[in-house]
């Protein structure tokens, strides 16, 4: 496939390619990423082993390759918006990853991010040099493929349109078509079972976090008399001062003022 060839070329010349695969939910973004990884690694299990929902697992792989003085041909950050969403750009872990992304080439030759829309951090998305839009094979595309001697079932195949993104000397975006890939939605059953289990675990974890957050908001709304304690509890749970202000329904200045007061009292 076109994208696989670009990744191989990048690896050989010690370059770096970053890819944003986007499209509606369930259209086949992960299927495309896995097919690309399979072409790169030649093994479905190895391909899946290089797909990550959890950033910690991906960072652990980077550290292992760095210790060995090697570079990873390809990793996949699936549903990257779960932890790299622009809606929470101020969190420290996201800022740290963006800074690491500037030097990622030392340990990684290419990375694919999948997301339903362009909801990644702006600083990160501006540095991604390939965009891939996943689309259904409609009547017009089907006829085009037939003219090129390609016959596929539109129900089980998708088209991945590849665009190169760069900036002009005036920092204006330049979009250039690089080609397209036609690929099947399906892959081996045992790989799908493994992937589905990983995804269910991630969904379960996310639901627990949402439930905990909702319960916290209910408790906060029911009792604002002990607001200093609530601020400290949320701070210990890893929430930023801006997030605490939103959760408690108070201004950021109030959060800073109360924390400063608590600090003075403890001295």
PLM feature segments, named:
Residues 24-25, 89:
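The conserved Walker
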Residues 55-110:
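Conserved nucleotide-sensing/catalytic segment adjacent to the nucleotide-binding pocket
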Residues 240, 251-253:
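Short coil turns linking two alpha-helices in DNA-binding domains
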Residues 243-248:
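Short alpha-helical "recognition helix" segments of helix-turn-helix
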């Amino acid at each position: 496939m076109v994208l696989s060839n670009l990744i191989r070329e990048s690896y050989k010349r010690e370059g770096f390619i970053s890819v944003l695969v986007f499209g509606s939910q369930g259209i086949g973004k992960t299927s495309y990423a896995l097919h690309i990884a399979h072409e790169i690694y030649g093994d479905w299990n190895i391909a899946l082993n290089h797909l990550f929902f959890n950033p910690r697992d991906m960072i652990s792989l980077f550290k292992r390759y760095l210790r060995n003085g090697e570079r990873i041909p390809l990793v996949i950050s699936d549903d990257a918006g779960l932890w790299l969403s622009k809606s929470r750009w101020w969190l420290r872990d996201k800022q740290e990853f963006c800074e690491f992304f500037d030097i990622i080439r030392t340990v990684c030759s290419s990375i694919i991010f999948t997301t339903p829309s362009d909801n990644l951090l702006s600083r990160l998305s501006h540095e991604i040099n390939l965009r891939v839009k996943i689309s259904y094979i409609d009547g017009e595309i089907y006829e085009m493929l037939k003219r090129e001697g390609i016959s596929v079932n539109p129900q089980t195949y998708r088209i991945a349109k590849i665009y190169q993104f760069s900036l002009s000397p005036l920092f204006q975006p330049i979009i250039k078509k690089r080609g397209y890939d036609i690929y099947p939605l399906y892959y081996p059953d045992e790989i799908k079972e493994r992937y589905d289990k990983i995804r269910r675990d991630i969904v379960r974890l996310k639901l627990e976090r949402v439930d905990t957050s909702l319960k916290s908001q209910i408790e906060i709304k029911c009792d604002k008399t002990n607001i200093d304690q609530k601020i400290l509890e949320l701070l210990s749970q890893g929430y930023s001062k801006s997030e605490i202000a939103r959760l408690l329904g108070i201004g950021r200045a109030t959060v800073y003022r109360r924390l400063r007061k608590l600090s003075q009292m403890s001295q």
